[in-house]
Regions:
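Single conserved hydrophobic/aromatic residue that forms the stacking wall/gate
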Residues: 1-11
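Interfacial loop-to-transmembrane junctions
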Residues: 130-155
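Selective hydrophobic functional segments
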Residues: 3, 99-136
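Small-residue-enriched transmembrane helix starts and helix-helix packing motifs
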Residues: 21, 41-57
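Interfacial segments of multi-pass membrane proteins
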Residues: 52-55, 68-91
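Hydrophobic alpha-helical transmembrane segments in multi-pass integral membrane proteins
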Residues: 3, 57-65, 157-165
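Lipid-exposed faces of alpha-helical membrane segments in multi-pass integral membrane proteins
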Residues: 19-27, 54, 94-101, 121-129, ...
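Transmembrane helix exit motif
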Residues: 22-40, 101, 105, 131-136, ...
Length: 165
């Protein structure tokens, strides 16, 4: 523990962020091409869930997307694009829920008055728009795949390298 204090700064280097952005973009492309699309959503095994959870540890590397690494792992386990993406969205729910409720709790400890109706309206609108966007995203990736996201990640990584030098 003590030896690791401050070590996170070693991996927050712009080169590492740029290269991991490119690397995981290319890995997404490979996984998308390699996926056999054979494993149904209902037959998720403990072993598959464990590997997908373990893969999320790679998201600690700056430039690695937690959602992307979840999708990559699920694709390599032969899940479809849609199922892999649903895994990524479902695994975000606990994190987003914790953030939401911790913000609500912290609002309760502020000295200013809170308009709870506004909080409810904003939360409802956020949920509905997210639900709509997820539906659009799932339809989109089923039709065109992940190639646009791969191109985006590779170009972003190259741009970051360009900025670094």
């Amino acid at each position: 523990g003590v030896r690791l204090v401050g070590s996170e700064m070693c991996i927050r280097d712009r080169d590492i962020i740029a290269l991991s952005t490119i690397f995981f973009g290319i890995l997404l492309w490979i996984a998308d091409r390699a996926s056999k699309d054979q494993t149904p959503y209902e037959s998720v095994t403990f072993k598959h869930a464990f590997f997908i959870g373990l893969a999320q540890c790679l998201a600690l590397i700056p430039g690695t997307s937690r959602s992307a690494i979840t999708i990559i792992c699920a694709l390599f386990l032969s899940y479809s694009r849609t199922v892999a993406s649903k895994f990524a969205f479902m695994l975000a729910i606990p994190t987003l829920g914790i953030i939401f409720f911790s913000e609500i709790i912290s609002l309760g400890f502020t000295s200013s008055e809170i308009n709870w109706l506004d909080v409810l309206l904003v939360s409802t609108f956020s949920f509905l728009s997210s639900y709509l966007c997820i539906g659009i995203f799932l339809n989109l990736i089923e039709r065109i795949g992940f190639t646009p996201f791969v191109v985006y990640r590779v170009l972003l990584g190259i741009f970051l390298l360009f900025l670094a030098y």
